[in-house]
């Protein structure tokens, strides 16, 4: 009942770096770090964790869509350390898309083309807009329904789709960067000023 008081008295301030230090210090065999954030600061810890034999499972798209050099470094570290770097939930809402692609490539197939709806948010918004429901209201509805990122500008700017495209292309064997993705934005930038 008095957890807040106890936390204030006995708790300690934390940050991602401190968390990483504590995990490494524990040195538990077969440790797995699960990142359910969207934080670049947390994603920046993966290399340190992996170099200390901690597997990483990430819903966070930051690492897998970061620079190609960082992405390949993380994949190589996982391979070299015989640990896991998994990010299946980065695309397809957890459907086994990345695993299936890896199975195809490992069996000698080459992925030449992917077709996908890469944004549930944009799909929801475009299916909701009508004469009665303006764009701005559809955005709010998507957010309330749990489709949109906490900051819908990430969806509307195309950033989330670009990250997913980069991750899928890399897993298909193509060394792409986010800057390589051609952008056809569906909104003028000034539309986003009123959000989140």
Which ranges hold each PLM region?
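A generic secondary-structure micro-motif detector
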Residues: 34-36, 64, 128, 155
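Rossmann-fold NAD(P)-binding glycine/threonine-rich loop
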Residues: 39-52, 61-89, 93-104
């Amino acid at each position: 009942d008095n957890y807040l008081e106890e936390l204030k008295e006995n708790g300690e301030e934390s940050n991602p770096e401190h968390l990483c230090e504590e995990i490494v210090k524990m040195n538990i065999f077969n440790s797995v770090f699960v990142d359910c954030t969207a934080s670049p600061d947390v994603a920046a810890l993966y290399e340190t964790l992996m170099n200390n034999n901690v597997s990483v499972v990430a819903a966070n798209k930051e690492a897998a869509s970061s620079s190609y050099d960082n992405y390949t470094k993380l994949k190589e570290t996982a391979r070299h350390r015989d640990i896991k770097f998994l990010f299946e939930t980065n695309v397809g809402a957890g459907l086994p898309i990345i695993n299936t692609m890896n199975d195809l490539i490992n069996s000698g197939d080459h992925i030449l083309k992917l077709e996908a709806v890469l944004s549930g948010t944009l799909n929801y918004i475009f299916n909701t807009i009508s004469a009665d429901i303006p764009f701005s209201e559809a955005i709010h509805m998507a957010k309330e329904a749990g489709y949109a990122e906490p900051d819908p500008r990430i969806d509307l700017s195309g950033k989330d789709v670009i990250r997913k495209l980069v991750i899928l292309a890399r897993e298909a064997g193509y060394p792409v960067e986010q800057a390589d993705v051609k952008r056809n934005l569906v909104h003028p930038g000034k539309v986003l000023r009123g959000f989140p």
